[in-house]
């Protein structure tokens, strides 16, 4: 019964939002027409430089995440890629027609805000809005704010909603991007060359895993999506490239859960004229250097039931 009520409520919300969209279009306003908005600052940038920006006019773009008030004074939270900031809107400080339109905006709408940086009586860093422009209308409601998007299945299948509702997920994306960029710089500085090897191969080799199989129409042969980058990288070493690596996607037609995806990224590298000790140097220094991207050096990181402290340590032989 509760699920039926939830579905009914969702249908009603969707219909209300479609009605608002139609009303805008009937009034000659296309909420998807604006393709450019001049953003001068981001939310966290305003907060970090509040003393210098206080009293100045800035422009921000982002998603409405909450709305409060709706009389002569309204408050809302604007979220952009850097975080959230409060927007303060007064009817007597905006065009009255524009203010009335703003009151009909929904949570999830993409808006542009132009206004003055100031601090409210309660001390909240805010933007006193002069203009609030609807840039894109949201027809689908966001998960309610108190519980957010907690269903793991939905979080992984609708990652775009997860990114909106869970700052930690966005943080993970940022850390991964920094990690891959750092990894490339680190290996490049050691004289390694990044290469791209074929994703499709007539044989499945380099690892013990079940491959995905596809058919090459022109050659009329079955081919395999790679389960490792090993074979082609070794051929490059044979060809005279002394240090090579690849950050690439791997495909293994096996089990799937929240920590095991059939499509994933690896970094595989090979170097000539060295031995096990040469690879040990990379093994002992690279994890420590990479760990500092996510936390300060020597920080304890809790992983499951274990506590891990990454330090630069010498290799111990037994």
Provide a role label for each language-model segment.
Residues 1-318:
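Class II aminoacyl-tRNA synthetase catalytic cores and aaRS-like
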């Amino acid at each position: 019964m509760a699920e039926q009520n939830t579905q009914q409520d969702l249908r009603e919300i969707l219909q209300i939002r479609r009605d608002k969209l139609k009303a805008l279009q009937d009034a000659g306003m296309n909420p998807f027409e604006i393709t450019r908005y001049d953003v001068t600052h981001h939310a966290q940038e305003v907060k970090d430089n509040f003393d210098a920006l206080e009293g100045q006019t800035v422009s921000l773009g982002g998603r409405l995440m909450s709305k409060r008030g709706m009389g002569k004074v309204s408050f809302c939270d604007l979220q952009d890629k850097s975080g959230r900031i409060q927007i303060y809107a007064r009817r007597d400080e905006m065009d009255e027609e524009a203010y009335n339109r703003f009151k009909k905006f929904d949570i999830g709408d993409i808006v542009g805000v132009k206004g003055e940086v100031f601090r409210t009586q309660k001390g909240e860093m805010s933007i006193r809005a002069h203009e609030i422009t609807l840039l894109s209308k949201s027809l689908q409601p966001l998960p309610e704010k108190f519980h957010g998007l907690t269903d793991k299945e939905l979080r992984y299948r609708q990652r775009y909603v997860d990114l909106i509702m869970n700052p930690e997920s966005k943080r993970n994306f940022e850390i991964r991007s920094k990690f891959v960029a750092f990894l490339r710089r680190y290996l490049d500085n050691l004289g390694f060359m990044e290469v791209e090897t074929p994703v499709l191969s007539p044989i499945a080799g380099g690892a013990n895993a079940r491959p995905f199989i596809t058919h090459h129409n022109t050659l009329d042969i079955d081919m395999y999506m790679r389960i490792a980058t090993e074979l082609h990288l070794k051929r490059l070493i044979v060809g005279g490239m002394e240090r090579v690596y690849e950050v690439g996607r791997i495909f293994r037609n096996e089990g799937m859960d929240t920590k095991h995806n059939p499509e994933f990224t690896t970094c595989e590298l090979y170097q000539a004229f060295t031995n096990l000790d040469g690879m040990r140097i990379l093994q002992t220094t690279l994890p420590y250097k990479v760990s500092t991207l996510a936390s300060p050096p020597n920080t304890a990181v809790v992983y499951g039931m274990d506590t891990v402290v990454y330090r630069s340590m010498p290799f111990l032989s037994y």
